[in-house]
């Protein structure tokens, strides 16, 4: 054994000096098989080419633990590829257990992956793998040339110049402090290391984001198979169509398998189970097995939102590198998102306060969003879209009625037109939108002065509520987003509309604010039929059937991959490193393009000696300033300007002196990040309140501020340095029509006395056409009727005969007659019109003495209850006994044998004519600080038909002020904060939006009351 180790060390020293490459010493083996023979089998056996014997898929294993505890993690499910004869013997394993085959374990569950791995762990892992597998290399880094190299050489070989003034790109391994850096001693580096309090804060923030920070220790939770650099074939594991079972230990584990990767440390630590090896005959253990289809699938999990921590999942992952030295120094890292394509799932972090970034990890944590605005997430370094069934890579979408994977057969379209004639002003319900409705379209048939409004069944106003008209835009309500459109008042004839995709999570009511005749409202939405079944759960797939029914391209085999890797390494060794010249220094750095790196290389290869950069030309590209910022405020963009300069003198020369292919591509840089000053955003004028003459029009004026190319509504006091534009203005569309007298007065209605005469008065437009009276000003209308006096008429008394019956059956009574003053034309006049010599109307009569006779006594009739029209009048009726000189009042039953005279009768005086009628007052528009209420006033004649004969001066008011008292804050039990961090909503000034006003009702109400008090004190 000692001689064997001595020979290995001697061979290692010789090859390091001569070739600068890596030598792997094999461990002593009892099998006495030569290494070249083993390598020959690996490279030449047909089993590695992907054309092995066909296998069958086993049962799906259990789902792995979710990669995140909140905000959307990923679960993985795998299945083993078994020999076709294994199923025939009934060898299926229940519960989806992992299948062990000759020392290699195929895991059905992939657990969480630590964020980092320390150098001690990597060395321990390399030693463990070497002891278990014999002649093998430890893989995991795609940049093996960066290991074992001096710090200065390592900087010159990174992918792009990493230095001030330019972004860099490359992998950042954990390195020790620079040996040549005398200013950063170990003691000083320890002082620069973040404190334990900072580390604890990072761990707490990480736990809020749904995962635990790495402990940098191997445990049983590590995956048994893990891909650090991806398969050499260039296909991700989830996209390969041929799944190959690992070869037996006798034939060597395939180092570049397209789907299986090197085994990490597990709980066995060198022990090899033999149970699975005994389950297969010898001829199967020496043959590769391939299955068609995907061997694993992913599903979204734990979609509940994480508690607010102020940092995203990428920020937490980058911050976990704050206590790790990079290039001999400590930095604070933040995400660098300005990458495209397949780099979105890499962990690219930018050093805070510095203008360079580093790829800290080739893959982010599973479940990390690919970008800030999209819905796709990263899984195993690949950006995957999410289907409506929460399966990654699924192509299922919602149909019209919101059924995942549905074919619209269970959908029902509900549509109609609301054409009811409305009479009173205010809100009138149009249609009810049920829960679960999709494809919602509410549109006015024609343009009008009416407004559409939207309210939830709970009473919360979403659009145009509380007599306040909102601007067109997007409003959230009922679990969906409504688009409120209001057409241009001049060029469009279409009416208002509400549009939403749905589905709604509660019942919504659509209202119309009625101001003029209803032009009709068309409504349409889609709901699911009652008997429709929503296929939310995807059907179970048969073994061997690929996910979503898609077959993928077959693997081209192990030999093709190794051949491509050899060619790629040869090309990399011959490619010249281009040079980039920066303005901060005259030093040049070779740039390694990411696509030219080999897909996989061993980590323990000894890199060749570094070569100095080529300086074949005397001129370089240099950054000389930047372009002007695209905006003066609110986050603009600018680009660096590169010019051709002399290498030594730095003098600018024509661009033809430099190689145009080496000119750096200008990258966009943010500038002028401070927000723009607030300004008044002026809306469009509403329609004039009158069709002719002077009227009023209104517009909305909001204080807004622009930042990051977004216009936000802010509090009005931010615009107090500017004069606020007027919100109301007078308007006149045209000159109103005028009154015109078409005829002279008619003759008086009576030949004598006082009568009436009339004339024809019409409303005429400015072009001479007769129009409705409403087009003219009713207050300026000339009289079309007046009284006329034709002089006194001859008059005399007209009398009737005396009544035949005395008013009393016994005793003294009277007889009466009617007396009327009449003109010679038989027209009635007041009694005073014929003078004072009025004839008597009653004369006494006596039917003899009374002897206690019982009778009903009636009093005189009262005046009529009304002055005009039909009314009533009353009189007293009592039962009395009449004696010779006195009357005795008796109980009514004493006269019950006699017919009782009526005590009430109808009376009718002169006709009333037209009068003003009004409705009850509406509710006040505000409960405090001055609102208004309205009512409808109409002129009606005696038969209750509309008339225009009422006196305009006596018309009652149609609108009046109400609730002028100051507002007193009231405690609403339903007004509560639904989230614990509503103070952030208040600080961000988001209370102007209905969603946050409801979610943080208590906090927003307190701020609004303070703001009102502040304005009142000024």
UniProtKB/Swiss-Prot annotation:
Composition bias of kind Polar residues appears in: 216-230
Keywords assigned: Extracellular matrix, Hydrolase, Repeat, Secreted, Signal
Q: Where is this region: Disordered?
A: 34-56, 116-240, 534-623
Q: List the disulfide bonds.
A: none
| A GO term, aspect molecular function | hydrolase activity
Expression across tissues is: Both isoforms are expressed in the embryo from 7 dpc through 17. Isoform 1 is widely expressed in adult tissues. Isoform 2 is detected in brain, spinal cord, eye, kidney, stomach and uterus. Mainly observed in fibrillar extracellular matrices in elastic tissues (at protein level).
Indicate the secretion signal residues. Answer: 1-26
Q: Which residues are listed as membrane-spanning?
A: none
Full protein name: Thrombospondin type-1 domain-containing protein 4
What's the source species for this entry?
Mus musculus (Mouse)
Whichever gene encodes this chain, its name is: Thsd4
């Amino acid at each position: 054994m000692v001689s064997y180790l001595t020979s290995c060390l001697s061979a290692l020293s010789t090859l390091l000096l001569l070739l600068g490459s890596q030598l792997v010493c094999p461990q002593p083996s009892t099998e006495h098989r030569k290494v070249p023979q083993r390598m020959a089998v690996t490279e030449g056996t047909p089993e590695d080419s992907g054309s092995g014997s066909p296998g069958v898929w086993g049962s799906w294993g259990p789902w792995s633990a979710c990669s995140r505890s909140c905000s959307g993690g990923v679960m993985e499910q795998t299945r083993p590829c078994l020999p076709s004869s294994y199923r025939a013997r009934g060898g299926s394993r229940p519960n989806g257990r992992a299948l062990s085959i000759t020392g290699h374990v195929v895991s059905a569950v992939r657990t969480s992956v630590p964020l980092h791995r320390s150098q001690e762990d990597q060395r321990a892992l390399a030693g463990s793998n070497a002891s278990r597998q014999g002649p093998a290399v430890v893989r995991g880094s795609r940049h093996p040339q960066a290991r074992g190299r001096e710090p200065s050489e390592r900087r010159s070989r990174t992918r792009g110049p990493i230095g001030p003034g330019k972004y860099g790109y490359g992998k950042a391994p954990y390195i020790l402090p620079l040996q040549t850096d005398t200013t950063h001693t170990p003691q000083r580096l320890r002082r620069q290391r973040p404190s334990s309090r900072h580390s604890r804060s990072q761990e707490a923030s990480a736990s809020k984001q749904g995962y635990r920070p790495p402990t940098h220790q191997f445990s049983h939770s590590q995956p048994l198979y893990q891909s650090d650099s991806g398969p050499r074939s260039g296909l991700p594991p989830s996209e390969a169509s041929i799944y190959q079972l690992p070869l037996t230990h006798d034939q060597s584990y395939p180092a570049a398998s397209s789907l299986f990767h090197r085994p990490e440390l597990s709980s066995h630590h060198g022990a090899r189970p033999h149970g699975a090896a005994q389950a297969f005959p010898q001829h199967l253990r020496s043959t590769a097995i391939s299955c068609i289809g995907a061997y694993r699938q992913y599903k979204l999990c734990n979609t509940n939102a994480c508690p607010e921590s102020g940092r995203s999942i990428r920020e937490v992952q980058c911050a976990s590198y704050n206590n790790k030295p990079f290039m001999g120094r400590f930095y604070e890292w933040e995400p660098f998102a300005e990458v495209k394509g397949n780099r979105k799932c890499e962990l690219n972090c930018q050093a805070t306060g510095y203008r360079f970034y580093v790829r800290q990890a080739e893959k982010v944590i599973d479940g990390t969003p690919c970008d800030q605005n999209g819905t796709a997430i990263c899984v195993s370094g690949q950006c995957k879209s999410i289907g409506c069934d929460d399966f990654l890579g699924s192509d299922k979408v919602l149909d019209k009625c919101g059924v995942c994977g549905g074919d619209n057969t269970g959908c029902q379209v509900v549509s109609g037109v609301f054409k009811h004639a409305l009479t009173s002003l205010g809100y009138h319900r149009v249609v009810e939108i049920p829960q679960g409705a999709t494809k919602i379209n509410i549109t006015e048939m024609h343009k009008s002065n009416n407004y559409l409004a939207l309210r939830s069944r709970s009473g919360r106003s979403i659009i145009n509520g509380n007599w306040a008209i909102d601007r067109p835009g997007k409003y959230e309500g009922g679990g969906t987003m409504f688009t409120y459109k209001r057409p241009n008042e001049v060029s469009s004839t279409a009416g208002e509309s509400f549009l939403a995709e749905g589905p709604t999570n509660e019942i919504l009511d659509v209202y119309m604010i009625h101001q003029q005749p209803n032009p009709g409202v068309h409504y349409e939405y889609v709901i699911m039929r009652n008997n429709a079944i929503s296929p939310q759960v995807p059907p179970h797939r048969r073994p061997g059937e690929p996910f979503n029914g898609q077959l993928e391209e077959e693997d081209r085999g192990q030999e093709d991959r190794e051949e491509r890797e050899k060619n790629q390494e040869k090309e990399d060794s011959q490619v010249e490193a281009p040079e980039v010249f920066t303005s901060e220094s005259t030093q040049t750095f070779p740039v390694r393009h990411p696509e030219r790196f080999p897909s996989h290389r061993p980590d323990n290869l000894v890199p060749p000696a570094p070569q100095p950069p080529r300086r074949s030309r005397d001129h370089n590209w240099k950054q000389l300033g930047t372009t002007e910022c695209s905006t003066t405020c609110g986050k603009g963009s600018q680009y660096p300007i590169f010019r051709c300069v002399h290498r030594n003198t730095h003098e600018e020369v024509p661009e033809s002196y430099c190689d145009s292919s080496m000119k750096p591509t200008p990258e966009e840089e943010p500038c002028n990040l401070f927000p723009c000053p607030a300004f008044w955003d002026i809306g469009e004028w509403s329609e004039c309140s009158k069709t002719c003459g002077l009227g009023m029009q209104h517009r909305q004026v909001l204080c807004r501020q622009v930042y990051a190319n977004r216009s936000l509504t802010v509090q009005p006091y931010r615009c107090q340095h500017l004069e606020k534009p007027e919100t109301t203005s007078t308007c006149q569309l045209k000159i109103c029509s005028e009154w015109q007298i078409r005829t002279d007065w008619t003759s008086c209605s009576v030949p004598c006395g006082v009568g009436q005469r009339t004339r024809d008065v019409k409303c005429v437009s400015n072009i001479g056409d007769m129009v409705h009276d409403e087009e003219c000003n009713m207050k300026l209308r000339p009289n079309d009727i007046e009284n006329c006096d034709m002089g006194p008429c001859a008059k005399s008394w007209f009398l009737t005969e005396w009544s035949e019956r005395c008013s009393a059956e016994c005793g003294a009574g009277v007889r009466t007659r009617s007396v009327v003053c009449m003109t010679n034309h038989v027209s009635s006049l007041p009694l005073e019109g014929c003078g004072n010599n009025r004839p008597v109307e009653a004369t006494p009569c006596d039917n003899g003495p009374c002897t206690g006779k019982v009778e009903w006594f009636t009093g005189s009739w009262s005046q009529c209850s009304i002055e005009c029209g039909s009314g009533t009048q009353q009189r007293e009726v009592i039962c009395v006994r009449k004696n010779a000189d006195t009357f005795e009042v008796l109980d009514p039953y004493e006269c019950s044998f006699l017919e009782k005279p009526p005590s009430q009768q109808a009376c009718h005086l002169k006709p009333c004519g037209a009068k003003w009628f009004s409705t009850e007052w509406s509710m006040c528009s505000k409960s405090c600080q001055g609102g208004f209420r309205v009512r409808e006033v109409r002129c009606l004649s005696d038969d209750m038909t509309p008339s225009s004969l009422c006196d305009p001066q006596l018309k009652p008011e149609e609108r009046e002020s109400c609730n002028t008292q100051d507002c007193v804050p009231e405690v609403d039990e339903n007004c509560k904060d639904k989230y614990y961090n509503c103070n952030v909503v208040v600080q961000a000034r988001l209370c102007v939006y209905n969603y946050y006003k409801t979610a943080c009702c208590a906090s927003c109400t307190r701020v609004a009351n303070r703001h009102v008090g502040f304005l009142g004190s000024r």
